[in-house]
Swiss-Prot record:
Family the UniProt entry places it in: Belongs to the tombusvirus protein p19 family.
Superkingdom of source: Viruses
Protein's recorded name: RNA silencing suppressor p19
Subunit structure: Homodimer.
One GO location term (cellular component): virion component
Function description: Viral suppressor of RNA silencing which binds specifically to silencing RNAs (siRNAs). Acts as a molecular caliper to specifically select siRNAs based on the length of the duplex region of the RNA.
Keywords: Host-virus interaction, Inhibition of host innate immune response by virus, RNA-binding, Suppressor of RNA silencing, Viral immunoevasion
Region feature Disordered, mapped onto this chain: 153-172
Length: 172
């Protein structure tokens, strides 16, 4: 059985548990292990002398089902190979398998969140809309990772990515 780890974020500690399951296990939606940088690596990359501030080491993403949150940090350098690898970090089947452990007869909240280049996008819905949520998450992840820093700023100032309004209407 996987071990539950409390998150460092106060809200996460109050409302949910973080499951640090191994990649490809039956309990996690992710196929790849967490690749969080060490504190030393993070400091070196984000030092004051660093010339390229828009070159993050990677991105964070999470899936949550009710109060259980699965998180991963994945390396991403913007190359085609890195994009292909990042897009394969989870699949419809792995999300459905992880969700099935927590979905009962009642409706619970399901959420996908991705943070990249200082921008965070969250998509959520009820467990009955999970399949549509997965489709939106796939499109959102692909779009967000392919945006340039200027395009990320533009999308943030517009409020939400294209298509989320229709999803909200369908899930209500």
């Amino acid at each position: 059985m996987e071990r539950a780890i409390q998150g460092s974020d106060a809200r996460e500690q109050a409302y949910s548990e973080r499951w640090d399951g191994g990649c490809g296990g039956t309990i996690t939606p992710f196929k790849l292990p967490d690749e969080s940088p060490s504190l030393i690596e993070w400091r070196l990359h984000n030092s004051e002398e660093s010339e390229d501030k828009d070159n993050p080491l990677g991105f964070k993403e999470s899936w949550s089902f009710g109060k259980v949150v699965f998180k991963r940090y994945l390396r991403y350098d913007g190359t085609e190979a890195s994009l292909h690898r990042a897009l394969g970090s989870w699949e419809r089947d792995t999300v459905n398998n992880a969700a099935s452990r927590f979905l009962g007869f009642g409706q619970i909240g399901c959420t996908y969140c991705i943070r990249f280049r200082g921008s965070c996008l969250t998509i959520s819905g009820g467990s009955r809309t999970l399949q549509r949520l997965i489709e939106m998450a796939i499109r959102t992840k692909r779009t967000m990772l392919q945006l340039t820093p200027c395009e990320v700023e533009g999308n943030v100032s517009r409020g939400s990515p294209e298509g989320t309004e229709a999803f909200k209407e369908e899930s209500e």
